[in-house]
């Protein structure tokens, strides 16, 4: 009887531990999603403010340029479209999000925003790193070979009225990448929860 009670106690304790780990995991995912949503909203606001300050002719000209432009993050392998995102593993979504955030580590310093975007990105990157470590149970999360090239020179340009094309490109790419990360983290969070419906 005593042995049965000991075994039962161990089982109950393990269940509580597992449940606690699940709650902590969800808390970390919630925090990461909230942070990237804030960054995405901030990027959209900066983009709107920038476009409102343009003359109609300038706005028309720039809207034709960006679809043909190349973002720094385009060199990062990432799920394309809803179907591919849905089929990607949680670990792949986290790795991709980590690399996208990392790609803005230096360019973000030129966004000229008083809200310390670089610090917000650094905090989010750290949080995603913790989530990756949790997914791989302490194994190496990112290979050294996965480190990618420094941002293109264009991305080091500061926002200025005399450089509308580069400023527009910088803001457009930032908004685009924050949207990507928000999507990837939201799907990853859903996958790690009890919700069985994670459609986009």
Swiss-Prot record:
Q: Which Pfam families match?
A: Hormone_1
Disulfide pairings:
71-173, 190-198
Q: Where, subcellularly, is it found?
A: Secreted
Q: Which GO terms describe its cellular component?
A: extracellular space
* Residues annotated for Zn(2+) binding in this entry: 38, 182
- On the tree of life, the source organism's domain of life is Eukaryota
Q: Name one GO biological process term.
A: response to starvation
Q: Which InterPro entries match?
A: 4_helix_cytokine-like_core, Somatotropin, Somatotropin/Prolactin, Somatotropin_CS
Note the coiled coil stretches, chain numbering.
none
Q: What is its main location?
A: secreted
Task: Enumerate the PROSITE patterns for this protein.
Answer: SOMATOTROPIN_1, SOMATOTROPIN_2
User: GO: which molecular function terms?
Assistant: growth hormone activity; growth hormone receptor binding; metal ion binding
Keywords of this entry: Disulfide bond, Hormone, Metal-binding, Secreted, Signal, Zinc
Q: Which residue ranges does UniProt annotate as crossing the membrane? A: none
The residue range of the signal peptide is 1-22
Which family does the record claim for this protein?
A: Belongs to the somatotropin/prolactin family.
Primary role = Growth hormone plays an important role in growth control and is involved in the regulation of several anabolic processes. Implicated as an osmoregulatory substance important for seawater adaptation.
**Protein name per Swiss-Prot or TrEMBL:** Somatotropin
| Gene name of the encoded protein | gh
